[in-house]
Each structure stands twice: as structure tokens, then as C-alpha cells.
């Protein structure tokens, strides 16, 4: 391992990317580089023009991201997990979901076994050994606060010195009542009137604002008024008149207030109601101290502001890693402030239609791109030219910038030639391919693209490589890492492929026993996708734009699964999301194994991903290209099928189940008994039977397996017992 470390140190020093701890190179020590890690939520490879060159794709304008790519290396075959939590846990631990238990987006009902374990060696814990200070700003979604002993303090427990942002999986739902002022049944029965949580259009009107004493006051800007979005962006709530329309005069706003009072409604808007990206719960954790407040700042702007403030506070301190985990473009789709957009005057008519959502998706990315440019300038890494363009010269900095999407794009805004029916939440190419860009001092031949396979778990090793840390030494040997190197691609433009395969998987998380999940159908451009693993409530299904079929859902209500929805013949064509799936691919072929609903198709799928200029230019795994249904495989395909199947089975078998081991050391001993006692009566990672409570049953599981060493191979372990 010393040889590996010296080699890694040499690479780091040659690139100017950091310092090493090996004694033979200490006299050459340089300040370790800072790491700025930018995560775009639900931005797949189809969204950025640097990765999707299809003439059919109307991609957003992203000059800031394009500038980073022009000064760095783009990775065109970067593979994530199909959903956010599994991807995020993978890149912060370097471990596949079947090892961490986080195989699906964490929902409020998921038990601790489906959340990141406090015993994982996360990258902030590893970097701390080299003196790094770590912060995360923005979306968290690794575990908690529900059903987690650490609650809102989870980021601190997982190693981050500072956290500020939205700890949940996405922004809150849109407030279609405009602060409780509008009720569709009372005012015209139009539930879509404020589908974006704000009056749209150029109309200027009255804005409710809170004074320092939190008393609502009407603000008309001396007669100039505000557009609905301007009011919302300022932290206010647009005032409605007596007809439930945007009030264009102070008299109209006063009449609306009086009319609501006569109807038994509150005459003033409710400033406690959350509203998508504009009004949300901000959680801050610093040195284990929790603070929470209701933020009324557009989320992407707030995330950038907090990031710049934190970076500036590190001046003169040691090396740092900042994860800027933007919440865009997670649903709900909502128009950003106009001053963040390059297309003045172009506005979506609503936030529910397919065309409108595609426009909103582009605008949310464009707004985020502008804020990424402001982030680089605020961090001292770039300057704004007179023409507004970004001038970024990473060679003069000591900061490596890594930008990724966390998984594929969500259904409504997928761009051609990628497949919306096989997007986020599925194991198919559109669901697991995302952009990745790395820029920093010493990158060889910037502006190039690497086509070789890179996995999301490899980021863990890249973070270590930048800091001069061998993560395989830093993590306990009994905890298997799946990471492989990335740094050689940055140093050497002619680097041979490092990975031969990438592995992806998705499951249903871990809900309390006996819990049922209502089926939800997501419809888009004639495609209908049914899932009974993603949305734990009918309201969550509705908030995502779906149709629920639970006890109070769409008629016929009470359907007990997607097969029942299919049997009801409600849709001409219904795709059912598998209950769980894994996939493995090499440079050309891809094998998928599904746990399907009883009414669905065969468990195995096999694809040739070689791109064809006309029928499959992106090399996708579309239904018509599935090989096993086309007859016997040819010799080359059969050989690859066998190799991929054997590799996947060996990989899955490498993680040995260890009942009674709660602290991830592959031993069942006194520390596990202590864990049961410390968490007795509540949920925890020591709840081995996943019934939602740590109790006598879990103690008995530890006692039954006491002193078992799960690292010993099966037959030998059986002999020992």
C-alpha cells in the first residue's frame, strides 16, 4: 500500500492538486487543494448542450457550466444511481447501495436501515484526517429527520462541520392558495388559477409584506406595484382582490381582505405557508447546534449566498471542501425570478402542462447556471467580464471544481433523444447517466471529453486523490469500498480505461412492516408510468403531478397495486416500475435484472448499447432494442451476457449479510448490544427486524449471533459456530 500511496502522491504533486503524507515527499508538501463540489438535482445528461448535441433537444443556456467545462474535463459516461439518496450516499461513502442499505430516495416513512448509517466513513470524516473543514449547503437527503435518532442534527453526525439548507428531498409543495387567500370553491372553482404558487404575467399589483413586528402591510411601491414573481422574490405574498384575482390597487387589496373576513377567512395572508422554491424551512447545523427558520429567499439564490459567505469565512484557514447541493431542478417546477433568466418576457402559462414544465425546467437550470457563475466569482475563482461572460482560469487557483448531476432527469422535462418513460427512478440509461465536469489547477489539455466509464462511487476516491489520501487505507478494511481512481483521467489525456464495468441499482427503501403504498400513475405525452414503491401517500403522488389510486384516489379508488391499475384497463399503455432492479454494463453491453410485479414482463433484459446514427444515436436501452426477446444471442453477445451476469452475481455476493451487526464492523459483539440499549424504544440502525423500534427482539438477535465474525467465509463460519 505504501507503493500505491507514493504513486498517488506523485500524481497529485505533478498536477499541483495537493499534498501527500508519505514521509519521502513531505519536503515537497504543498497546500492541499480546496474542493468545490457542485451537485445539480435531477439534471441528467440530456439537459446540457455540452453532453447532448441532438438537434431535437432545446437545451437551456448554461454559459457558466460551459465555461467550467471549457477549462476542465467532461465525463460523458458518468453513471449514477436512479434516484438522489442512493447516488448521494454512494459518492459520499464510495459504496454501492446494497452495502449501505440506501437503495431508494429516502421518504418520511423509511426506517434508519434505509438511511445513511452514522457509522459510515463519509468523505468529510476522511478529509478531516488531512485537516479539511467540510460544509454542505443546500439539499441534504442522506437521512433524517424522520425516524432517525439524530433528526435534524444528522449532517453534523455524518461529519460536516457546517450545514445550511433544505434537509428534505425537495422543496415543499407550491402554495396554490397564495398564503391562504384563495379557495377554488369560493372564487370561481378554478384550481389551476395559481398553479405556480404565484400570479403570473406582467400585471403589477399590491404585495403583502411583513414589517419588523411581523405585522402584514400592503406595499404598492408608490404606485409602481410589483409583478407576482417580484413580490414573491422579495419575500412577500401577492395581494388578492374580492374576486380572488391579483389586486392591482390598494383599494382592491383592501376589498379582498374585507371580503375574506366576511366569508370567515383570515383577512390577512398566512406567512407561515411554505411555497416551493420561494418559502421553505431552512435548517442550519454548526458545531452540533441546530437553528431553523422559514426562509423567504428563492432557494437557488439562498444556496449561493450561503456558499459564498462560508467560503469567504475560510480565508486564512486550512483546506476546505464545500458541497453546494442545489435543489433545482427537483419538482415542483416553478418559475425563477426574472433577473436570473436570459430570456426576458418568456413565461410559462402555468406549472402543470407538459410544454410549460419543459420551459420551466430550462429556466430553472438557466437560473442555477447564473448563480453558479456568481458562486465562482464570489469564491474568488472567476471574474465577470464587461460583457457579462465568466472569466475562469483554474490554473491560478488552489481549488478543484467538480460539477455533477445526481441522477437522470425527471419524466416531464427529458429531452430527446433520451427516453422519458425510462428516466429518473429507473435503471435505464436515461435514469442513470448524468453530466460530470472536473476543473482545477494542473488539468491536462482542458476542454476535452472522456468517454470511459466512471461510476458515482468513484467520486469518493477522487476526493481522496485530490487531498492526497488513499481512501482504501482510510476506511476500515472490513468495510468494502467500490471506488476506483479518477485522477489519472485529469492528468493524462491518453489515459486507458480504468473501469471495465459500472453497476447501478434501485429498490423500495425500508418501510415499517405492514405498510402499504398506493399505486401512482405519472402521465406524460401519451406515456403512463405506474409505481407502487415511490410515493408513500396519495398527496405525495399528487404533489409530483401523478394520479393516485389509493383509498381516496382517482376512481376506481382503492386499487392495491399497479397490476390492479392495469387490470382496470384505465390506460391504453401502462409501464410498471419494477419493485427493485440492478444493472451492470461494460463498454458496449448492458444486463438488467428486475424484480417485477406479478403481471409484468420477464426479469432479465439485455441490450447492445452501440450507438447508431439514425435509430439510436445516444446508445440507449429502449424497449425495441432488448436482445433476449429477439431470439438466440450471437457469440459476442452471449459471451458478454455471461461475463456481465457472473460479474454482477460475484459483486452482490461480496457483501455478506451480518444479522446483529449495527455498527458496520462485520462483528456481532458488545458494541452492538450497547447500541441496542442506547437506542432502546426508538428507531435506529440497531433495529434489526425493521419493525420501527429497537427493543427486546433486536437484543435477542444480537445475543443469538453474539461473537459472530461475518468477515469469515460461510463454510468456515459455520464450522466456527
Where would I find each of the regions flagged by the language model?
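Short, structured active-site-proximal loop/turn typified by the sulfatase FGly-forming signature C/S-X-P-X-R
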Residues: 53-88, 133-135, 158-167
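Active-site-proximal N-terminal segment of extracellular/periplasmic enzymes that hydrolyze or transfer
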Residues: 27-73, 140
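Alpha-helical segments with a strong preference for the paired helices of cellulosomal dockerin domains
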Residues: 662-683, 691-719
Amino acid at each position: 500500500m505504501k507503493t500505491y500511496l507514493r504513486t498517488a502522491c506523485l500524481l497529485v504533486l505533478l498536477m499541483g492538486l495537493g499534498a501527500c503524507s508519505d514521509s519521502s515527499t513531505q519536503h515537497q508538501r504543498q497546500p492541499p487543494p480546496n474542493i468545490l463540489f457542485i451537485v445539480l438535482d435531477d439534471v441528467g445528461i440530456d439537459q446540457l448542450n455540452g453532453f447532448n448535441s441532438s438537434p431535437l433537444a432545446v437545451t437551456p443556456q448554461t454559459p457558466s457550466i460551459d465555461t467550467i467545462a471549457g477549462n476542465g474535463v467532461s465525463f460523458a459516461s458518468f453513471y449514477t444511481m436512479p434516484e438522489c439518496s442512493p447516488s448521494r450516499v454512494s459518492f459520499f461513502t464510495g459504496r454501492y447501495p446494497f452495502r449501505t442499505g440506501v437503495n431508494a430516495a429516502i421518504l418520511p416513512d423509511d426506517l434508519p436501515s434505509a438511511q445513511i448509517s452514522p457509522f459510515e466513513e463519509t468523505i468529510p470524516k476522511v478529509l478531516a484526517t488531512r485537516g479539511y473543514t467540510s460544509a454542505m449547503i443546500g439539499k441534504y437527503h442522506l437521512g433524517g429527520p424522520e425516524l432517525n435518532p439524530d433528526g435534524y442534527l444528522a449532517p453534523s453526525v455524518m461529519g460536516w462541520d457546517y450545514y445550511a439548507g433544505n434537509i428534505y428531498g425537495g422543496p415543499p409543495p407550491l402554495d396554490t392558495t397564495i398564503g391562504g387567500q384563495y379557495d377554488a370553491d369560493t372564487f370561481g372553482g378554478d384550481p389551476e388559477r395559481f398553479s405556480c404558487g404565484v400570479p403570473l404575467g406582467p400585471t403589477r399589483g399590491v404585495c403583502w409584506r411583513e414589517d419588523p413586528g411581523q405585522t402584514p402591510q400592503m406595499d404598492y411601491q408608490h404606485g409602481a406595484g410589483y409583478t407576482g414573481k417580484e413580490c414573491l422574490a422579495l419575500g412577500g405574498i401577492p395581494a388578492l382582490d374580492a374576486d380572488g384575482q391579483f389586486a392591482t390597487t390598494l383599494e382592491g387589496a383592501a376589498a379582498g381582505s374585507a371580503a375574506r373576513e366576511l366569508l370567515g377567512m383570515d383577512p390577512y395572508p398566512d406567512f407561515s405557508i411554505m411555497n416551493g422554491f420561494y418559502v421553505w424551512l431552512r435548517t442550519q447545523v454548526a458545531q452540533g447546534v441546530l437553528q431553523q427558520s422559514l426562509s423567504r429567499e428563492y432557494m437557488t439564490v439562498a444556496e449561493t449566498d450561503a456558499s459564498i459567505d462560508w467560503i469567504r469565512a475560510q480565508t486564512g484557514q486550512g483546506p476546505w471542501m464545500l458541497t453546494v447541493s442545489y435543489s433545482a431542478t427537483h419538482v415542483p417546477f416553478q418559475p425563477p425570478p426574472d433577473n436570473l433568466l436570459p430570456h426576458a418576457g418568456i413565461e410559462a402559462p402555468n406549472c402543470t402542462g407538459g410544454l410549460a414544465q419543459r420551459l420551466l425546467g430550462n429556466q430553472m437550470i438557466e437560473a442555477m447556471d447564473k448563480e453558479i457563475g456568481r458562486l465562482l466569482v464570489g469564491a474568488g475563482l472567476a471574474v465577470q467580464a464587461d460583457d457579462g461572460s465568466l472569466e475562469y482560469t483554474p490554473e491560478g487557483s488552489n481549488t478543484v471544481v467538480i460539477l455533477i448531476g445526481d441522477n437522470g432527469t425527471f419524466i416531464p422535462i427529458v429531452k430527446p433523444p433520451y427516453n422519458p418513460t425510462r428516466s429518473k427512478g429507473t435503471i435505464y440509461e436515461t435514469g442513470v447517466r448524468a453530466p460530470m465536469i472536473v476543473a482545477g489547477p494542473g488539468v491536462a489539455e482542458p476542454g476535452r471529453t472522456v468517454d470511459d466509464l466512471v461510476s458515482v462511487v468513484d467520486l469518493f476516491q477522487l476526493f481522496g486523490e485530490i487531498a492526497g489520501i488513499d481512501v482504501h487505507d482510510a476506511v476500515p478494511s472490513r468495510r468494502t469500498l467500490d471506488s476506483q481512481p479518477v485522477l489519472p483521467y485529469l492528468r493524462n489525456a491518453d489515459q486507458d480505461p480504468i473501469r471495465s464495468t459500472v453497476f447501478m441499482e434501485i429498490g423500495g427503501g425500508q418501510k415499517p412492516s405492514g405498510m402499504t403504498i398506493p399505486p401512482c400513475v405519472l402521465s406524460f405525452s401519451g406515456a403512463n408510468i405506474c409505481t407502487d414503491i415511490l410515493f408513500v401517500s396519495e398527496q405525495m403522488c399528487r404533489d409530483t403531478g401523478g394520479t393516485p389510486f389509493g383509498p381516496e384516489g382517482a376512481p376506481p379508488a382503492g386499487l392495491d397495486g399497479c397490476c390492479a391499475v392495469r387490470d382496470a384497463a384505465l390506460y391504453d399503455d401502462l409501464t410498471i416500475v419494477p419493485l427493485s432492479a440492478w444493472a451492470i454494463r461494460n463498454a458496449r453491453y448492458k444486463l438488467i435484472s428486475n424484480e417485477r410485479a406479478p403481471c409484468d414482463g420477464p426479469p432479465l433484459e439485455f441490450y447492445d448499447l452501440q450507438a447508431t446514427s439514425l435509430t439510436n444515436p445516444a446508445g440507449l436501452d429502449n424497449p425495441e432494442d432488448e436482445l433476449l426477446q429477439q431470439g438466440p444471442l450471437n457469440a459476442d453477445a452471449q459471451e458478454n451476457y455471461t461475463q456481465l451476469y457472473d460479474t454482477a452475481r460475484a459483486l452482490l455476493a461480496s457483501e455478506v449479510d451480518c444479522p446483529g451487526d449495527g455498527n458496520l464492523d462485520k462483528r456481532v459483539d458488545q458494541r452492538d448490544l450497547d447500541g441496542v440499549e442506547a437506542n432502546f424504544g426508538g428507531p435506529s440502525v440497531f433495529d434489526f427486524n425493521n419493525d420501527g423500534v429497537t427493543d427486546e427482539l433486536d437484543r435477542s438477535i444480537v445475543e443469538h449471533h453474539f461473537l459472530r465474525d461475518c468477515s469469515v467465509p460461510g463454510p468456515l463460519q459455520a464450522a466456527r459456530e
